[in-house]
Design a protein with these regions (language model features):
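Short glycine- and acidic-residue-rich catalytic loops of nucleotidyl-transferase/cyclase enzymes
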Residues: 1
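Conserved, well-structured core segments that form or line functional sites
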Residues: 4-183
Length: 183
């Protein structure tokens, strides 16, 4: 097993979004392991980011973004999808999280296909809601300590040769920030 990636220190959310690319997101369910290489992320900070859930302050939904780094912030959107984020913030920005937008499936393909009800590998984890569904990530994992957890964690993976940056997807504010990163 790859050693776990430790995100215990305060680091800028945008830097962590880049660092997560190429790492492996792992989900253990009983004796099954599902994993994928992180291929796309988005950074969401605090007071300088009107697209962030943390922009207007702490709420019951976003409280994880204000708490310990390295924990999961999972939220429900569009009435049907969960999205998984890793809390990452700096001393300058007291809240933040990195949305994991896409994965390249690595292990547990059969279970991913079953969870997503599709055989199309290219469609399994090609969006934040799809990957959460494929890895069976729900609000039950909200606040999960990704560094210490045995059911949801991140390990070393590959070193990206090139990282592409562009504006984030599906937002109406903060469009000038090129905080969508992909390999």
């Amino acid at each position: 097993e790859f050693r776990r990636v430790l995100f215990r220190s305060l680091q800028d959310t945008v830097d962590v979004a880049r660092q997560l690319l190429g790492k492996v997101l792992v989900r253990k369910i009983g004796n099954n392991t599902i994993s994928g290489i992180i291929t796309e992320t988005e950074a969401y900070r605090h007071s300088d980011d009107p697209a962030s859930h943390a922009y207007r302050g702490i709420t019951p939904r976003n409280r994880a973004m204000f708490e310990k780094v390295g924990h999961a912030y999972v939220y429900f959107t569009y009435g049907m999808y969960h999205c998984v984020n890793v809390v990452a913030k700096s001393s300058r920005h007291p809240a933040g999280a990195v949305l994991i937008r896409a994965l390249e499936p690595k292990s547990g393909l059969d279970l991913m296909k079953k969870n997503r009800n599709t055989d199309k590998i290219s469609n399994l984890t090609s969006g934040p809601g799809k990957l959460a569904m494929a890895l069976d990530i729900t609000k039950k994992q909200y606040g999960e300590d990704i560094v210490k957890s045995k059911i949801l964690y991140i390990t070393d993976g590959i070193t990206p040769k090139k990282i592409f940056a562009s504006p984030r997807i599906g937002i109406s504010a903060g469009l000038e920030k090129k905080w969508n990163f992909r390999i």
